[in-house]
Structures are given as C-alpha cells and as structure tokens.
A protein has these predicted regions:
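Conserved class I S-adenosyl-L-methionine
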Residues: 47-55, 145-202
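A short glycine-rich, Lys/Arg-flanked "PGG" loop and its adjoining helix->strand segment in the class I
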Residues: 129-141
Length: 294
C-alpha cells in the first residue's frame, strides 16, 4: 500500500507549480515576519534555518531568506523539487541547500538549526509523532520552531471533512461536480443559471468565476484530494510539545489577504479566539512558535 505522505507529495507538486502563477503565491512568500512571530527585529540575521516539507516552490524558504537568514536548508520527499526551487530562489544563490528526505527521519545532525519552519505538513503524515520528535532533535537548544497544523472542530471543517469529502469519495455525481469546479469548468453551467435566473444567472457565474479563482480552486484540491488531513486540538498539541521539550509555546496571529471567497474567513486567522471564529472554524489553522528548552 502506498504511503499517504508520498501520495500527498505527488499531489502537491502539481498544486504548488500552478500556485506560482496565482496571487496566492505572493501571499505565501510573505506569511512570516519578525513582527507577527513576536520576535526581535533582524532575528533571522546569521541564523541557520530549515524549511521542512518545503513543497515544490520553496515559498517558506524564500520568506526566510528575504528576512535575512544566513542559510536555509529545504527538504521534501522527491527530487522533482530541485528545478523549480532553484529557479524561485536564484536571487539567493549560495545561501540555500536542497535535500530529499522525510520528516520521520530528517537528514540532519542533532542540534543543527537555529530555526525550523514546518507549515501545513505534519497533519499529512502517517506518523506525526516522529515528525515532532525529529524537529526537536535537529533544533539547537534555545532554537525556535514555527509549526502550522490543521485545528479541530468548527462547522466549516465538519462540513468539509464529514460531508463533502466522504460524498466526493462515494458519490460519482458529487465527484464530477467538484472536479469541474476545481478544474475551472464553471462556465459549463452558464446555461443552467441563465435559464433559471436570466441575467442574474450570468452575473452569478461571473461572481463564482471571480471569487472561486485559481488560488481557491487549488486550496479545494488540497483539502479534497489529500488522503490524510489530521486535525489537532490546540491544548493537547501544546501539552505534547511541552513533553518533548518544545516549550514557551504561543500562538501566532496572522493577517491573511485573500482575493477570493476565502476573504470571508480571513479574520478568523487573526481573531482565532472570537466567538464567530470558534463556532465556524474551531481551533482553526493552528500556527504556533515554540522554543527548545532541553
């Protein structure tokens, strides 16, 4: 049987390469700053960093290099990451190294990194505990890690993971409709909307095409097609990290800019503790920063 993380890597290669051409790419290469991580100015200067599960574009590594990192090591599971990453990071040539490996067994020495970035990776793993342990192993004492995982609860995730995805897998009509939306074939339904809503139908199709843009469709593919999307309880996650020696953990507030329908949920990334956020999004996207204390 094929491992889930390898299936995910092959899927994401296609998604990431398409993402480069969307406004969403500008968003993901500017997610981090010393300010939103609550770190001192010029924190990354002279730091040796890692972008684990870097994807096919190396967006996180580019973000770190732009912040002044001395050196960034990128790692993912397949050598097809080399060509696009070298192209995307060429202005930082000589300051990054690319590795093929797995979070379950990182190809790095103990106590090697000052800072480890791991965004949206561990919740896809077959053995997430190994991933957390390996991050702890390769961090220097006093080093910091920024980890992002999918949180638990909320009406939106429940609808996605308990209704939409199961129906996608077992109902061929649902699968066909979602595939056509994800493949930007919404205009096939122009006649349907036009017959039922006349001119309003045409406007609706234009609205859907604008706000269900390529960036959003790639996000849908991420959620719907990924074979494994583990969800974490925030308090339990922090408790388990503490046991490993990853302490002083705090959650990061992110001001995220979307140009599509996801703009409606953007406030939930920042005001994650708001009543509306908790009801609709539960623990949300859990973005934390921890320090290795032992």
């Amino acid at each position: 049987m094929k491992r889930h993380d390898k299936i995910t890597r092959n899927l994401f290669n296609k998604i990431h390469l398409k993402q480069i051409k969307t406004p969403g790419y500008k968003r993901v290469v500017n997610l981090l700053s010393e300010k939103n991580l609550n770190l001192p100015k010029d924190f990354f200067k002279d730091k040796i960093c890692a972008d684990l599960g870097c994807g096919s574009t190396g967006a996180g590594a580019l973000n770190l290099l732009n912040l002044g990192a001395k050196e960034v090591h990128l790692m993912d599971m397949h050598k097809h990451i080399f060509k696009p990453i070298k192209q995307n990071l060429k202005k930082h040539d000589g300051k990054f190294k690319i590795h093929v490996g797995s979070l379950e067994k990182l190809p790095f020495k103990n106590n090697f990194f000052d800072f480890v970035l791991c965004q949206g990776v561990i919740h896809h793993m077959d053995d997430d505990k190994k991933g957390f342990k390996e991050i702890h192993r390769v961090l220097k004492k006093g080093g910091k890690t920024h980890i992002v995982v999918q949180g638990n609860g909320g009406l939106i995730p429940k609808i996605m993971y308990n209704v939409i995805i199961p129906q996608y897998k077992k109902n061929p009509l649902v699968k066909k409709l979602l595939n056509e939306i994800m493949d930007n074939k919404i205009y096939k339904y122009k006649r349907f909307f036009n017959l039922n809503l006349n001119k309003k139908g045409v406007k609706l199709v234009k609205f859907l095409s604008r706000y269900f843009d390529e960036d959003f469709r790639l996000t849908m593919k991420d959620r719907v097609l990924s074979p494994n999307y583990y969800q974490y309880e925030e308090k339990k996650l922090i408790k388990n990290l503490n046991k490993l020696g990853l302490k002083k953990t705090y959650r990061i507030k992110k001001k995220v800019q979307f140009n599509n329908i996801r703009a409606l949920v953007a406030p939930m990334y920042y005001e994650y503790d708001h009543l509306i956020s908790r009801v609709l999004y539960g623990d949300g996207d859990i973005a934390i920063l921890s320090t290795k204390t032992k």
